[in-house]
């Protein structure tokens, strides 16, 4: 699956939909 907004991440491919990985957290663009 994918990681939701505000979940910890290492890269943007881990995050759901349009979310980007910023500062180690999935953030909406």
UniProtKB/Swiss-Prot annotation:
Free-text note on domains in this protein's UniProt record: The presence of a 'disulfide through disulfide knot' structurally defines this protein as a knottin.
InterPro entries associated with the record: Toxin_23
Family that this chain belongs to: Belongs to the neurotoxin 15 family. 01 (magi-5) subfamily.
Pfam families membership: Toxin_23
Cellular component GO terms held in the UniProt record: extracellular region
Tissue: Expressed by the venom gland.
GO-annotated molecular function: sodium channel inhibitor activity; toxin activity
Stated role: Insect and vertebrate active toxin. Binds at site 4 of mammalian voltage-gated sodium channels and shifts the activation voltage of the mammalian rNav1.2a (SCN2A) channel to more hyperpolarized voltages, whereas the insect channel, DmNav1 (para), is not affected. Causes temporary paralysis when injected into lepidopteran larvae at 8.6 nmol/g. A low intracranial injection dose into mice causes lacrimation, closure of the eyes and sweating. A high injection dose causes extensive lacrimation and death.
Keywords: Disulfide bond, Ion channel impairing toxin, Knottin, Neurotoxin, Secreted, Toxin, Voltage-gated sodium channel impairing toxin
Cellular localization per UniProt: Secreted
Remaining remarks: The primary structure of the mature toxin is identical to that of beta-hexatoxin-Mg1a (Magi-5) from Macrothele gigas (AC P83561).
Designated name of the protein: Beta-hexatoxin-Mr1a
Originating species: Macrothele raveni (Funnel-web spider)
Paired cysteines (S-S): 2-16, 9-21, 15-26
